Design a protein with these regions (language model features):
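A short glycine-rich, Lys/Arg-flanked "PGG" loop and its adjoining helix->strand segment in the class I
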Residues: 121-133
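A short acidic, Gly/Pro-enriched loop at the edge of an enzyme's catalytic core
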Residues: 94-103
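Conserved class I S-adenosyl-L-methionine
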Residues: 1-48
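A short SAM/SAH-binding and catalytic strip from SAM-dependent methyltransferases
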Residues: 102-118
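C-terminal lobe and adjacent flexible extensions of AdoMet/dcAdoMet transferase-like proteins
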Residues: 202-257
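SAM-dependent methyltransferase
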Residues: 138-210
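Class I SAM-dependent methyltransferase SAM/SAH-binding core
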Residues: 50-94
Length: 257
């Protein structure tokens, strides 16, 4: 998608509607992450409007964030408890907070928002840079095959159908570059709006290699926040990484064993 600016995907209009339809996994994610934090400070890459950070903070975890979009930060600040979360504006692949954490996490497919393999590797390296010796980096994404219909790299999906508006996801996937170009088109009685976004889809195996290049190792992988075992039928994954030369992360099942 020519002249695409990643920051434009989360402008004022998108930020204003971002929480209109929550995924429903917020509390499960917060409980999972709280166990891993084990009383230590946490850092969320791409904290957004605080969809996960605020429930996690409600569990007593001190949460910091890094966020590219000033509009998403503004929405977070306007929420109850949002002013208690320290946020640094910047690119999560390179921006630092000056602290180390027991938990760094990146959810809702957001690793895909980095559009080159090098940037995705830099994101893993930045997570490693922020971890303490027993810290854990958590990544949650869909599996690419769950997004791309078999043999259909171009598709249109009806995301919302209402009496006065419809929202369509118009997409094209390039398996060579692994880039998925999407435009979320809202057609309503008040007009038409478009919200473009480009993602670079990667598999769990690719993430594991990126982690190794960044000095991390895979500790555990689940199919969801409920710790369902990851298998061939899974459509998403929650993966836990630790420093290659670090101790087993606190709060992980292997540590508990």
């Amino acid at each position: 998608m020519k002249q695409f600016d990643p920051a434009s995907s989360f402008g004022a209009d998108v930020a204003a509607r971002y929480d209109d339809a929550l995924r429903g996994d917020e509390e499960a994610a917060a409980q999972f992450l709280c166990e891993l934090a084990a009383g230590r400070r946490a850092l969320e890459f791409a904290i957004g409007t605080g969809r996960i950070a605020l429930p996690l903070a409600a569990h007593g975890v001190t949460v910091d964030g890094i966020e590219l979009s000033p509009h998403m930060i503004e929405r977070l600040r306007a929420k109850r408890g949002g002013d208690g979360i320290e946020v640094v504006q910047g690119d999560m692949s390179v921006t630092t907070t000056g602290r180390r954490y027991g938990l760094v996490y990146l959810v809702f497919n957001t690793i895909f928002n980095l559009l080159t393999a090098d940037d995705q590797i830099r994101c893993f390296a930045n997570a490693a840079r922020h971890l303490d010796g027993a810290g854990c980096f958590v990544v949650e994404t869909a599996l690419p095959h769950a997004w791309i219909p078999s043999g259909q790299p171009d598709y249109v999906h009806a995301e919302q159908i209402g009496l006065d508006a419809v929202v369509l996801d118009v997409a094209r996937y390039d398996p060579v570059t692994q880039l998925l170009e999407e435009n979320h088109v809202r057609i309503s009685t008040s007009g038409i709006t478009m919200n473009p976004i480009v993602c670079r889809l990667i598999t769990p195996g690719e993430m594991d290699l990126m982690a190794r290049l960044a000095g991390l190792r895979l500790v555990e992988r689940f199919a969801n926040w409920q710790r369902t075992p990851f298998d061939a039928q899974s459509t998403a994954h929650v993966s836990l990484y630790a420093l290659s030369d670090g101790v087993q992360p606190a709060g992980s099942a292997l540590h508990a064993a």
